[in-house]
Amino acid sequence: MFTPALIKQFQWLFKRRVKRVRACPSPECGHDPTIRQRLWRPTPSVRLQGSPFCFPECLERELLRRLQHTSTAPRREQVNSCRVPLGLMMLSRGELTSGQLQQALELQKKTGTGRIGEWLQQLGYARDVTVAAALASQWSCPVVKSVPSGVGSCTIPFYLLKTFCMAPVHFSSDRRMLHMAFADKIEHRALFAIEQMMDCKTEPCLTTRAQIEGALLRMEEQNSGSEKLFEGISDPEERTRIISSYISTMRATEIRVASCGELLWARITGNELCENLLFSRIAGRVLQFVSKKLPEPSLS
């Protein structure tokens, strides 16, 4: 039998507050349970960017704080100012003449649309593979001739891939390195978002627009639909409510969020399901990725 002294010690232990083992990092967390409460009535916990928060109060508060910071942070796209202009690079390589370059530049200026590489292809002065190789040299990255057909199993939201005209090429599980192919230019903001959400490193490469189009068409056919797009929702509080609702419905254990240009990407993971939520500031937002048809070249 337990002695009165031992019973008293057990009573003290079960009533004791356990601040040292409280996992929630929120400074405003009101949950400071005793050991008994932790054993019989544990507080639900969801990991946000790897840190466990009490759900819903602490997580919603921290999520709202992060979304408010994201909505006010300046949106800057990384630009390599040291890059040699594409036309001059191709001219120095002997891949076109100065007259051909001048004609393409005049058309670009006159129409106010299209990239110089697109105009060179439109005029028949360069092939897509030649332009892709020059772009790869310009961005100091590899060029790939084709995008593997197995990219359909990728878990990156299809809408995000289509928006930034990119496709996954290869993933190394040992190094946790994801190689992403782009057409036209490298979107570093998209790469940074992928690293945050997928917990991996990324390496960019370049390929032709035709290869990206083909890869995205294959992905669209195999798209499982595990993503939701919310257009015209920019209020951080409304976004927080939507995300919290999905967390509760899915009984999620982890959530990650990242800003990517005009898009907010939220990735919610449960025991068996994974859902991607995308929030666009503009309703009916036009995608960057389209099969481009430039105006007919005319200098008259």
Roles of regions detected by a PLM:
Residues 36-51:
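Short linker/helix segments within small regulatory modules
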Residues 28-39, 58-62:
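Cys/His-rich microdomains that often coordinate metals
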Residues 21-29, 54:
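Short cysteine-rich clusters marking metal-coordination/redox-active sites
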Residues 6-23, 44-48:
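Short, flexible, mixed-charge glycine/proline-rich loop motifs
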Residues 12, 40-41, 72-81, 102-110:
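Short, recurring structural edge motifs at helix starts
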Residues 4-9, 15-17, 123-196, 233-263, ...:
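Polyanionic, low-complexity intrinsically disordered segments
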Residues 214-231:
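Short, low-order "capping/linker" segments at domain edges
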Residues 50-72, 278:
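Short metal-binding segments enriched for Cys and/or His
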